[in-house]
């Protein structure tokens, strides 16, 4: 069976990126909660 993690930067950015989060009300709530919590990063690093 194929492993579940098949790295793809474009897919990662489109699914979990900042602009993807801003696009939906739920995504904006995610960013809001992460800001309140004081997270260093609001979204996963894509180009790392």
Swiss-Prot record:
GO terms for biological process: translation. The keyword Ribonucleoprotein applies. Signal peptide: none annotated. Transmembrane segments: none annotated. Residues 26-48 are annotated as: Disordered. Gene3D superfamilies: 1.10.287.3980. GO terms for molecular function: structural constituent of ribosome. The keyword Ribosomal protein applies. One of its GO terms (cellular component) is ribonucleoprotein complex. Residues 29-42 have a biased composition (Basic residues). Part of the 50S ribosomal subunit. This is Large ribosomal subunit protein bL34. It comes from Thermus scotoductus. The lineage of its organism: Bacteria, Thermotogati, Deinococcota, Deinococci, Thermales.
């Amino acid at each position: 069976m194929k492993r579940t993690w098949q790295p793809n930067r474009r897919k990662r950015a489109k699914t979990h990126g900042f602009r993807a989060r801003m696009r939906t009300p739920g995504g904006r709530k995610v960013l809001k909660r992460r800001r309140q919590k004081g997270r260093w990063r609001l979204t996963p690093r894509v180009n790392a």
